[in-house]
């Protein structure tokens, strides 16, 4: 097994942690944007359907 120094190990753990945080943050932002878009779209569809029902 290769001898890995303590410093390299700490650095790799830090990089892995930072990339995980960054990835999770971006994924959560995307998820929120998708949910907001879906909510807005469904509300628009509901309004259109209610308008049709009112006209009928």
Curated annotation (Swiss-Prot):
| Mitochondrial matrix topological domain residue ranges | 2-9
Can you cite a GO biological process for this protein? positive regulation of mitochondrial membrane potential
What does UniProt give as GO cellular component? mitochondrial inner membrane; mitochondrion
Topology relative to the membrane: Single-pass membrane protein
Name the cystine pairs.
none
Task: State the InterPro entries in the record.
Answer: Mtln
Keywords in UniProt for this one?
Membrane, Mitochondrion, Mitochondrion inner membrane, Transmembrane, Transmembrane helix
Report the subcellular localization: Mitochondrion inner membrane
Q: Which residues lie on this side of the membrane: Mitochondrial intermembrane?
A: 28-56
Q: Which residues cross the membrane?
A: 10-27
Keyword check for Membrane, yes or no. Answer: yes
The entry's function note states: Positively regulates mitochondrial complex assembly and/or stability. Increases mitochondrial membrane potential while decreasing mitochondrial reactive oxygen species. Increases mitochondrial respiration rate. Increased mitochondrial respiratory activity promotes myogenic differentiation which facilitates muscle growth and regeneration. Increases mitochondrial calcium retention capacity. Plays a role in maintenance of cellular lipid composition through its interaction with cytochrome b5 reductase CYB5R3 which is required for mitochondrial respiratory complex I activity.
Family membership noted in the UniProt record: Belongs to the mitoregulin family.
Name the UniProt record assigns to this protein: Mitoregulin
**What species is given as this protein's source?**
Homo sapiens
Which lineage? Answer: Eukaryota, Metazoa, Chordata, Craniata, Vertebrata
